[in-house]
Amino acid sequence: MKNGFKISVVIPANPAEIYEAWLSTRGHTSMTGSAARVSGKVGRRFTAWDGYIFGRTLELEPDQRIVQAWRTSEFPVEAPDSRLEVLLEKVENGTNVTLTHTGLPPDSASSYKQGWKDFYFTPMKDYFGK
């Protein structure tokens, strides 16, 4: 996938718990370990990782799907927002979380893919695994 990627991980929680945490300020901050401001409403802006990540929520399907216009402070000013789709699917030992992240600046996809692993998936496994 040019300027994007798809990645999945199983998190030890049900889809509703992950959905709620992703879309609430307290939950997002707790599951990542870094300050966030998030709303569970379409059209609302969000920030995460102390403002490094920011954007707007575009589509929501409760407990199943989140779509956001997404960027970081490292994006070139003239670059359009990327598109993040989060799919939540119940599996035997938790929820399969699949991220499809497209429209990233050229040559940045591998760095952002690793960032999702290090700064989201690892802390989410720890948080929900308690």
Q: PLM features: residue spans?
A:
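Hydrophobic beta-strand positions in extracellular immunoglobulin-like domains
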Residues: 11, 101-103
